[in-house]
Amino acid sequence: MYDANVSSYIGKLDELDAQYKSAVESFSKKTILFGDRFPFRYLVDDYGLNYYAAFVGCSAESEASFETISFLSKKTDELGLKSILTIEKSDKKIAKTIISNTRNKNQKTLEMDSLQSTTSKDAANGTTYLSVMQNNLNVLKEALQ
């Protein structure tokens, strides 16, 4: 039973991995921008994506400098990005400030879930690693358009 469950789960992980690879390959854009902390370094490295972020990793900082906001706003314009990414439970303040300093001021904020805030109640209600990463894939697809 254990071996069958492990094999089944590994198969689901492999399928999800293939979906990420296929999605990234299908878009000409390969850059995302996070107006927030950035806990997705391994994900972007694994799938060959470029990124810009207000903070490196899961920094404890909560206020981005003027220079950082200015740089990210210019990158958004330069790359023609239609969205700014945040993490779950973010106040989106930095992302909104970046957007307000872009040329068109019409980008969306999209949210990816790092799983760092997942509770036992979430798990009891059906939240799984696979379900969260599938939702993140859908967000990533929108961000790469």
What are the roles of these predicted feature ranges?
Residues 1-145:
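Extracytoplasmic metal-acquisition and chelation regions
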